[in-house]
Regions:
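ASCE RecA-like P-loop NTPase motor cores
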Residues: 1-333
């Protein structure tokens, strides 16, 4: 009846009004938190609010987008000597990006040769230049390449993505097609996933950022690393946006001086999952055709370890023949 309808409309209006009031309170609290998180004299600090993926909690973050002054005062000026060492500190043959990022003005530099024979141990396959991760049909075109790579290496692979959305899309396209044991990041805790991968013959792990670095799987158990795209930082990240803006305010290209060096370092980290000993061998497959079609692609690829480039995945047969054959037994589920 009309009275009942009026009552329901009134309840709905009250609910909407209460929700709007809640949003206003959250916005007001966030503004107050942000204003308190960054002192007025801290111009090099950026603050932002993040919301949890699975709940309604909000988190206020603040960080300096240039850490050089802080490190000079807190570390370099107080310590007689500081040694910075890693396999991926340099982008190519230069420490310029790292030095500028950390505010290092004077330092002795050393780029030591690798103990690995990458030309003999590793093959690098880059997808055709018309394969662009920005295209709508990228996943549809990339999935068959992923499938062929996995068939050629009998699984034993990390398939690394820069986003969960792309990971899920490609995995869905391969559902029912892969004969190898597979797991996706998030199905188990990270440590449990690694234990599963190391213990499972012919395993395939689909992962994102957390598996790009700090992972050590020696031997044929990891014989293939597939990377979906050139890992440029996201311009939507507040710190990335601030650093790009700071560079461009000084008349420098944010893409050239920040995005490209960042992608090089990140790609080298992903590459580094493959060859962990002098007896390792395997395939790095980059599915981003921009590495071939764009001018900056050569800069990025040339900074990688000198693996032998292949244009056809059938060239892997010679690599497997040179080393001990892969075990191809696939466990029954």
């Amino acid at each position: 009846n009309e009275a009942e309808s009026e009552r329901r409309r009134d309840l709905a209006l009250r609910a909407v009004t209460a929700h709007i009031a809640t949003v206003d309170r959250i916005e007001s609290a966030a503004r107050q938190a942000l204003s308190g998180a960054v002192p007025a004299d801290e111009r090099d600090t950026i603050a932002w609010v993040e919301r949890g993926d699975r709940d309604a909690r909000y988190e206020v973050n603040a960080a300096p987008f240039e850490v050089g002054d802080f490190l000079r005062a807190a570390l370099f000026a107080r310590t007689p000597s500081v040694v910075l060492t890693s396999a991926t500190l340099a982008e190519g043959r230069s420490f310029a990006f790292l030095r500028e990022s950390l505010g290092v003005e004077a330092a002795q530099e050393l780029i030591a040769p690798s103990p690995f024979d990458y030309r003999r141990q590793a093959r690098l396959f880059i997808a055709p230049g018309n394969l662009n991760p920005k295209d709508r049909d990228f996943a549809q075109k990339a999935a068959p390449i992923v499938e062929e790579c996995l068939d050629r290496t009998s699984g034993r692979a990390f398939v690394l993505f820069t986003s969960y959305a792309r990971l899920r899309e490609v995995r869905a396209l391969l559902a029912g097609r892969l004969t190898f044991p597979t797991k996706l990041q998030g199905e188990l805790p990270r440590a449990a996933l690694l234990d599963w991968f190391r213990a499972t013959p012919n395993a395939v792990l689909f992962g994102t950022g957390t598996f790009w670095e700090g992972i050590d799987v020696v031997g044929d158990q990891l014989s293939c690393v597939i990377i979906d795209r050139l890992p440029f930082p996201s311009p939507a990240d507040p710190l990335v946006a601030a650093r790009i803006a700071a560079l461009e305010a000084r008349g420098r290209s944010g893409f050239e001086h920040y995005m490209i060096p960042s992608a090089i370092v990140r790609l080298k980290q992903g590459f580094g999952r493959l060859i962990r000993s002098k007896s390792d061998r395997g395939l790095i497959a980059l599915l981003d055709g921009r590495a071939l079609s764009m001018r900056y692609g050569a800069t990025i690829v040339d900074a990688l370890p000198p693996a032998t480039r292949i244009a056809d995945l059938s060239a892997l047969d010679a690599l497997w023949a040179e080393f001990a054959p892969l075990r191809t037994s696939i466990p029954k589920d």
